[in-house]
Amino acid sequence: MKKPLGKIVASTALLISVAFSSSIASAAEEAKEKYLIGFNEQEAVSEFVEQVEANDEVAILSEEEEVEIELLHEFETIPVLSVELSPEDVDALELDPAISYIEEDAEVTTMAQSVPWGISRVQAPAAHNRGLTGSGVKVAVLDTGISTHPDLNIRGGASFVPGEPSTQDGNGHGTHVAGTIAALNNSIGVLGVAPNAELYAVKVLGASGSGSVSSIAQGLEWAGNNGMHVANLSLGSPSPSATLEQAVNSATSRGVLVVAASGNSGAGSISYPARYANAMAVGATDQNNNRASFSQYGAGLDIVAPGVNVQSTYPGSTYASLNGTSMATPHVAGAAALVKQKNPSWSNVQIRNHLKNTATSLGSTNLYGSGLVNAEAATR
């Protein structure tokens, strides 16, 4: 199954003897919430879906109990289903040995909330002078979409936000991120780190600037399926998600370099998905090469980039200055595109390690990771 399904029914493989005080009718009236069901293996997902199709809008748990469930999406590359069901029914479903976990489909938000010298600071023009502009490199921007803009060349994309089928940006965040990666060298507006990189608008956050784990996981799956070289995730959540970690791992195994924002709370630990081992975690610095006060730091931080007063593209063919680790992350994604153009045979792991090895040290690895991304050194 490769696309969202309508309301259907699931039944577990085992009959679980669980007593409930509520009736089926009252359970049907309970408000449902979104969950992600992780299975031990892909085959178990198929068996579960077959059980779904064999019943009539209920999951049969025992002779006494039936549970309504709505299947929203079946992932292709990770053994996970996105569903809606009553919170009261989660414990019963978790007793199925084929299910490894059930987690809430948590909200994930952008990493910039306030209103770009950064291109020069990371020495991108020096790489441009060598003929390295990101040409031929595909960069997926998993964000609020990207608005049509005279300073951007958007090659395609997809939306995974319910009710927002267009990849146009109703928020501004994604358009700003896209400009830092690849604003065109066309004598107007601003210049991106990799002005000839191919931008793909992968909408996973709505106009409000928030979205769900399932939308982001679908966006990562799309990136892997469509040959993206780099995925920029200027977003995050304080809570871990097994589904999101699997999606990051799957995309990485398919050649995508996942670059993610460390977070904006200023805390001494980084957000998810940046904290996952296969994501490249990016913190923010100011004009003095100091850690930005809001930039989260700590174990797992890979690298830093400019994230204060960053000028970039904005909806309505305009420009805006924003702050955040969201603004730092695309500097690194753009630098990755430059390195990929210079070394087309390199894997995502090689590119990540090279960016870290060529970064300019700023001091404590706890605060700055390997240091400030350096596009000039990375493309020598």
Curated annotation (Swiss-Prot):
Residues 28-112 form a propeptide. The keyword Oxidoreductase does not apply. SUPFAM superfamilies: Protease propeptides/inhibitors, Subtilisin-like. Residues 1-27 form the signal peptide. It is found in: Secreted. Binds 2 calcium ions per subunit. The active site is at 143 (charge relay system), 173 (charge relay system), 326 (charge relay system). Its cofactor is Ca(2+). CDD domains: Peptidases_S8_Subtilisin_subset (cd07477). Belongs to the peptidase S8 family. This is Alkaline protease. It comes from Alkalihalobacillus alcalophilus.
